[in-house]
C-alpha cells in the first residue's frame, strides 16, 4: 500500500500536467520554462563555479547542449570571464535560447506552433511516463529482493522513486526542447 501511495503521488503530478496540455492551455510559458531548465541543467552538469572560467569545459558544453538547442558555438563573454560565475553564463544562454525560440515562432502561424507544442509535449509525456512506470515496477521488485539491513524498503523506494521521477521530468524537458527546435515547416507545392 505504501508503494502504491508513492506511485499515486507521481501519477497525480503527471496527470495534472497532461490535463493542462489536453485542455488546450497555452503551453508557451511552460515550454519556455522547460527550455531554460534544459539549458541550466546542461551547464551545471558540465561546468562548476569552483573552477576559474578559463578551465570551464566549453567544448563539452557545446557537445552536450548544441544538439538540443541550436545556439551558436558557446564562448565566454568578457563579463562572464571576469565574474567567474556560472550563473551569468546560464542567464545569457537562457536569454539566447528564448530569443532563438521566438525566432523559430516566426516560421509558423501562432496557433500552429501552439498546437505543435501540445502534440509534442503529449507524446513525450506519455512515452516517458510509461517508461517511468516500468522503471518503478523494476525498482519495486529490486528493493523487495534486496536486504536493506536497518533501512525501511518503503523509504528507499520513495527516495529512489523521487530521483527517478526528477530524471524523467528532466528528460521530458530536454526531449521536448530538442523536438521543438528541430521541427520543420513543410509546404506543399500545388501544380
What feature does the model see in each segment?
Residues 1-191:
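Extended, charged helical/alpha-beta scaffold domains that provide interaction surfaces
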Amino acid at each position: 500500500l505504501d508503494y502504491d501511495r508513492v506511485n499515486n503521488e507521481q501519477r497525480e503530478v503527471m496527470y495534472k500536467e497532461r490535463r493542462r496540455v489536453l485542455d488546450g492551455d497555452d503551453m508557451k510559458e511552460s515550454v519556455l520554462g522547460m527550455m531554460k531548465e534544459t539549458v541550466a541543467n546542461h551547464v551545471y552538469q558540465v561546468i562548476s563555479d569552483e573552477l576559474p572560467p578559463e578551465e570551464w569545459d566549453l567544448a563539452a558544453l557545446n557537445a552536450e547542449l548544441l544538439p538540443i538547442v541550436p545556439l551558436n558555438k558557446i564562448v565566454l563573454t568578457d563579463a562572464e570571464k571576469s565574474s567567474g560565475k556560472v550563473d551569468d553564463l546560464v542567464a545569457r544562454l537562457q536569454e539566447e535560447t528564448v530569443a532563438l525560440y521566438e525566432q523559430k515562432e516566426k516560421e509558423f502561424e501562432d496557433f500552429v506552433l501552439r498546437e505543435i507544442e501540445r502534440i509534442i509535449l503529449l507524446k513525450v509525456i506519455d512515452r516517458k511516463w510509461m517508461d517511468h512506470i516500468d522503471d518503478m515496477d523494476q525498482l519495486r521488485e529490486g528493493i523487495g529482493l534486496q536486504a536493506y539491513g536497518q533501512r525501511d524498503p518503503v523509504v528507499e523506494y520513495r527516495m529512489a522513486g523521487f530521483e527517478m521521477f526528477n530524471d524523467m521530468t528532466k528528460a521530458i524537458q530536454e526531449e521536448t526542447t530538442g523536438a521543438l527546435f528541430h521541427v520543420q515547416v513543410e509546404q506543399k507545392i500545388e501544380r
